[in-house]
Amino acid sequence: MKQYDTFIIGHLCIDEILNSAGEGEFSIGGAVVYSSYAALAGGNHVGILIKSAPREKMIPYILPVHTEDIYWLRSDSETTSIRNQFLDDKHERRITTALAQGSTITVAELPEGISAKIYQLAGLMKGDYEDDIIKVLAQRGKVALDMQGYLRVPDPSTKEMVYHDWDRKQEYFPHITYLKTDAAEAEILTGTSDRREAARLMVEW
């Protein structure tokens, strides 16, 4: 049994970054990528489960995670890709568009023979994970979750990212130990802009 402090699960993302002048570049992104750097910097033994199309299969191996600690999944669709179009030079306002979304990470795709203190779901948009993956992982260790992976949804016509409430939140919140949400996401979840009240409601769930 291979043991990790943190096991991070998510999609590789090919980011397109456009500045306010419309000039652009592509970069490797995704919460699973950046979270692995942060977890390693904290001295943790880190494993990652990362999903992409076959043509991007080798990209995760440039990460500082040891090769034997990278578990790659084949996406049945494309590699997730997101465009961030910044509207000002300070990068404070932007339009985010889903160019492609990888296939859902399912319970059946979780690797065998590993255990972790924390399983981090580093999602990018709704549909990244099969919902029941939360309950399954909570039986194995503590679950950490970024709410953008459950609230952020591509608009069917424009593909711009919009936010919708999670209708199964009260069913799954008791299985989450570490929850990351910003003020806007917390208001969508709870219906209140009062941060303390929003935090209280989420803890009660």
Q: Can you annotate each of these PLM segments?
A:
Residues 2-5, 14-26, 41-122, 127, ...:
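Conserved N-terminal subdomain of the carbohydrate kinase-like
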Residues 10-12, 31:
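Active-site metal-binding loops of divalent metal-dependent hydrolases
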Residues 13, 124, 148, 184:
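Anionic group-transfer/hydrolysis microenvironments
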Residues 31-41:
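Histidine-anchored nucleotide/phosphate-binding helix
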Residues 48-52, 144-148, 180-183:
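Short internal beta-strands
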Residues 79-80, 150-153:
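Short gly/pro/ser/thr-enriched loop/turn and capping motifs at secondary-structure boundaries
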Residues 152-205:
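Conserved phosphate/ATP/ADP-binding segment of small-molecule kinases
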